[in-house]
Amino acid sequence: MQQKLEDKHVHKGLRKQMVDLLREKGITDESVLTAINAVPRHYFLDSAFVTHAYEDRAFPIGEGQTISHPHTVAYQTQLLQINKSEKVLEIGTGSVYQATILAEMGARVYTIERQKKLYDLHKDYVFKAKYPTIKFFYGDGFEGLPTYAPFDKIIITAAAPFIPPKLVEQLKQGGIMVLPVNEGDGDQQRMIRISKDANGEITEESFDIFSFVPMLTGKNR
C-alpha cells in the first residue's frame, strides 16, 4: 500500500480514461462505471505498482494473490446486477478493491479471505469509515457464511474447480451468483452466472473466458 494516500487530479483523469476503456470493452452498466470512477484503485496497490494503477492489468498483492484487471472487476459486477442495500457475499477479499466497488454501489458486503496475512491487513482498510457496510471474515470460501445467509448476490473472485453447492444453498430465491469455473486443465475459466428463481430452481449461463488464481479449500495461516 502507499505510505501517503492522495487522490490527485492526475489520478482522477487516469481513472476516467480507464472507465472510457471499460466502456469500449463492452461494460454498459453506468452504475458499475460510476462506482469504478469513484474509487481510487491506486490506494489498493503496493507502491511499486501505483504508477500503473489505471492500466487494465492485474497486480500481485502478496500471498500468491492478485488484484484483478479493472475489466474483470467491471465484468463480474455487471453480471451481478447489483441493487442498493442488497446483501452480497464475496469469496476472496484480496485487496478489498472489489468489495469497495460493491459498497460504493450501495451493497452490504460480507467478504471472506482464507489467507490470514491478507485478512490481518484488512483492519487497516483505508475506507473503513466511508464503507462501514463491508464486513470482513477469515474463513473457507467453499463453506460461505451460513450464519448470515441467505444472500441476494454472491461473487467468487478466484478460479473455482466446480460450482460450490454450499454457496448455491446460501443464495436467496431470486438471487444471482457469479463465478469463474475451471475449463480443461484449469489454466482458464469460464465466467458463469447462476440464477435461483422463486421456486429455488437453478439456471446457469456461460459467458467469456478469464484467468484467475485458484480458489482453495480451508484457511491458510
Locate each region found by the language model.
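Class I SAM-dependent transferase core
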Residues: 1-89, 97-101, 105, 118-120, ...
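Conserved nucleotide-cofactor-binding alpha/beta core module
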Residues: 81-203
